[in-house]
Amino acid sequence: MWTEFCNSAEDVTYQVFPRLAALAEVAWSPKGHKDWYRFVKSLDNYLYLLRSKGIRYSEAMFNIQHKAVAENGKVKVTLECERPDVAIRYTTDGMEPDISSPVYTAPLIVDHGGEIRCATFDGTGKMGKTLTLDMGWNLATGKEVISPNVSDKLLTNGVRGSLKQSDFEWTEWYTPKDASFTVDLGKASPVSRVVLGLSLIHISEPTRHLRIS
């Protein structure tokens, strides 16, 4: 356990629990008897024990992962959670999801800007954190990106990346050569302004030259 980013004992327990339970499951379960779905369900009793002892632990297993893909002028948003026994509920009006919100059963097809909020729920209420996707919309949103760099396709999915690389919304060019990509608008369209967003952190720097053709 590397503790350079931990400022208290609670930070340490947050990092190691329930990961220690997963490590024990892998080490102690006989070969051929490892069952992910049984394990995550059995964690409920273990987490109850941690709470009763006042031990802070991570609830990341209840958080939602997303994938937003530009497709035929729209954006397909896929949501998933590590826990198979919870329901993902969502809203598209900017309101916080609750137990009465629609249940996610299939990818959401987005054709305009707005805010999607989603969270996981079980029989007792909300679990984990709310995922908020602020869907921006412009002439390029939902359009095809032609580029050898697979991550460039994120440029037109309407979701802006955060400072956390784990949001999977980063587009990166680790090359000394110029980065080049084409956004296919599908037809001749007037363009009044082009904006390129950059996260100015220690491993990136703004472009020196930008050519649009």
Question: Model regions: which residues?
Answer:
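Flexible, acidic glycine-rich loops studded with aromatic residues
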Residues: 1-75
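Solvent-exposed segments in extracellular or luminal domains encompassing
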Residues: 106-113
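Short proline/glycine-enriched turn/loop motifs at strand-loop junctions of beta-rich domains
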Residues: 81-87, 188-191
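A short, hydrophobic C-terminal helix/tail in secreted or cell-surface proteins
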Residues: 203-212
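Disordered, acidic Ser/Thr/Pro-rich linker "stalks" and the adjacent N-terminal cap
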Residues: 131-188, 193, 197-204
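Short beta-strand segments within Ig-like beta-sandwich modules, predominantly Fibronectin type-III
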Residues: 96-104
